[in-house]
């Protein structure tokens, strides 16, 4: 890392950026150019390397996040399907039990005696 020192004003806002403190203030292009002009070639190379590393890290995190979201969506879809299947099975079992209860509740009808009369 480079040994660059920064000066902060009391008007600067310190915010938490993913666990790292970060200074927020209006962008001052002239101050940035002045800072870059004062940096040595090695410091500039380190800065460029840090920026590229940060970019690669961000891309890696985005790719990982996309894969995790995709996997979670698949798992959620499977889980929803399983719940729907269980719901259908429970519905079928309930209907079956109700039919069995209705059959049990119906008293057996007395059989009519059929008398064969001979003529």
Swiss-Prot record:
User: Which residue intervals are annotated with compositional bias (Acidic residues) in the record?
Assistant: 95-106
UniProt region (Disordered), positions on chain: 86-119
Report biased composition (Basic residues) as residue ranges: 110-119
Protein's name in the database: Uncharacterized protein V5
Q: Which organism is it from?
A: Sputnik virophage
Q: What is the lineage of its organism?
A: Viruses, Varidnaviria, Bamfordvirae, Preplasmiviricota, Maveriviricetes
